[in-house]
From Swiss-Prot:
HAMAP family: Malate_dehydrog_3 (MF_00487). One of its GO terms (molecular function) is L-malate dehydrogenase (NAD+) activity. Keywords: NAD, Oxidoreductase, Tricarboxylic acid cycle. Substrate binds at R81, R87, N119, R150. The active site is at H174 (proton acceptor). The gene is mdh. This is Malate dehydrogenase. It comes from Chlorobium phaeovibrioides (strain DSM 265 / 1930).
């Protein structure tokens, strides 16, 4: 198993280290355009192997040829958000970056699975799919796992319970229009609505929607990377080990939820072939309308890029 990570920034480097430590691949390649950065970080990771107890070969490069024959490619390249910048502000700039990255990746790997982390996530997943020519089930966006992790962590904090006992789904686009589905949220099987008042739940939902920008506002000069990297690696682990995990991921819908040919976050089964099944769960009218409205925003942004791809 060979996994390439594009982008040696905080998210990419953190993800590469987690992949190595979990020994999900025999070889991890970290690629970045800045000379020396991927090489130095990769060497540092590799040298941690004897004490972190892994044998994964970690290599850094500025040459996409070193990504040849990758089974999975994690794409984290792109500009990060700055304070006051929405994900949509990044649209045109990151489209050009992802178009170039995907073209380079496909030049050297025949049928990889692409995991997208770059923002605006849903639209960049569409761009990568369009440019790569891969089957839609092999181009997957990370957002839902991250948004759900934030939702679960805030619930655990409010209840002072283990995060492992929180089960939840956050659907829709990765942005202000995401849809945390409260009725499917439970704590060790107990519905969340039996444990927290509506006002508290509403506040947690709102905080989840603003989870990324909350971190941006704290950091001033950067954005989240620990949770995004962990979320991406959770997806990769399910694929590598063919675990068939049910995770909320950005995938291309084909009529499910009344949404067609749009990349949107929904529950999927992740296995060795990528998205092996899209689960269409029952939503009430308000939830379904919110999901469709979220998808409509993604679709509008994708259409605006027609001339740029």
């Amino acid at each position: 198993m060979k996994i390439t990570v594009i982008g040696a920034g905080h998210v990419g480097a953190t993800a590469a280290l987690r992949i190595a430590e979990k020994q999900l691949a025999r070889e991890v390649v970290l690629i970045d355009i800045i000379e020396g950065i991927p090489q130095g970080k990769a060497l540092d990771m590799y040298e941690s192997g004897p004490v972190a107890l892994f044998d994964t070969m970690v290599k850094g490069s500025n040459d996409y040829a070193d990504s040849a024959d990758s089974d999975i490619v994690l794409i984290t390249a792109g500009l990060a958000r700055k304070p006051g910048m929405s994900r949509e502000d990044l649209l045109m700039k990151n489209t050009a970056i992802i178009k170039d990255v995907t073209t380079q990746v496909m030049r050297y790997s025949v049928n990889p699975i692409l995991i997208m982390v770059s923002n605006p996530l849903d639209v960049m997943t569409f761009v990568a799919h369009t440019v790569s020519g891969l089957k839609p089930e092999r181009v997957i966006g990370m957002a839902g796992v991250l948004d759900t992790a934030r939702f679960r962590s805030f619930i655990a904090e409010a209840l002072n319970v283990s995060m492992q006992d929180i089960n939840a789904f956050v659907l829709g686009g990765h942005g202000d229009s995401m849809v945390p589905v409260v009725k499917y949220t439970n704590v060790a099987g107990i519905p969340l609505t039996e444990l927290l008042p509506k006002e508290t739940i509403d506040a947690i939902v709102e905080r989840t929607k603003n989870g990324g920008i909350e971190i941006v506002n704290h950091l001033k000069t950067g954005s989240a990377f620990y949770a995004p990297a962990a979320s991406a690696v959770e997806m990769i682990e399910s694929i590598v080990k063919d675990r068939k995990r049910i995770l909320p991921c950005t995938t291309c819908l084909g009529g499910q939820y009344g949404i067609n040919n749009v990349f949107c976050g929904v529950p999927v089964k992740l296995g060795k072939e990528g998205v092996e099944q899209i689960l269409e769960i029952n939503l009430d009218d308000n939830e379904l309308k919110a999901l469709q409205a979220s998808a409509a925003i993604v679709e509008k942004n994708c259409k605006s890029l027609a001339s740029a791809i």
